[in-house]
């Protein structure tokens, strides 16, 4: 029975994320993610302070500067999130890396007798698995506990800093 439960996607997941922009984070709005079995949807609403700011702008054409929740319809093979947020999600290779890391962490947790967490990852898990410091674009996400996601954990691999990229490129050319 335990094995069968692990293969079923998370039964119900609700997440609320604050969406910020820039290194000196300015609150832009709130994203809501809901999953019920295989069904999932997301909504975004601008924060009132963002809407009142003289330098405000729409994050994308499909998210006009209006009050209230704006729902995004997931296209087949598309993201559940609006395009501005979807652009920060990992690509296919990144998703594979995240899945392998997730499997390795679950295996380690099981060996040490700890809760291994869910077997499958959902859209918000992938969105938040990207390093906050190396995420594409200027959007940053803060979880319900007030922590920017994903903050690098000590002794955990992350995307290499920009300073190391020149060395990595040289090494790849040498191969």
What kind of region is each of these model predictions?
Residues 1-175:
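Phosphate/dinucleotide-binding and metal-coordinating scaffold of catalytic cores
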């Amino acid at each position: 029975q335990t094995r069968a439960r692990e293969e079923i996607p998370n039964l119900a997941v609700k997440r609320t994320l604050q969406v910020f922009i820039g290194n000196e984070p300015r609150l832009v709005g709130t994203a809501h993610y809901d999953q019920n079995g295989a069904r999932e949807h997301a909504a975004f609403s601008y924060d009132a302070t963002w809407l009142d700011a003289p330098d405000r702008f729409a994050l994308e054409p499909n998210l006009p500067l209006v009050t209230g929740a704006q729902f995004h319809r997931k296209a087949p093979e598309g993201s559940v999130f609006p395009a501005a947020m979807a652009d920060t999600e990992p690509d296919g290779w990144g998703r594979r890396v995240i899945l392998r890391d997730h499997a390795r962490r679950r295996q380690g947790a099981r060996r040490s007798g700890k809760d291994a967490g869910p077997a499958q990852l959902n859209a918000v898990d992938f969105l938040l698995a990207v390093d906050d410091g190396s995420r594409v674009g200027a959007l940053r996400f803060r979880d319900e506990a007030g922590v920017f996601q994903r903050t690098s954990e000590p002794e955990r691999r992350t995307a290499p800093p920009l300073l190391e990229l020149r060395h990595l490129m040289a090494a790849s050319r040498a191969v």
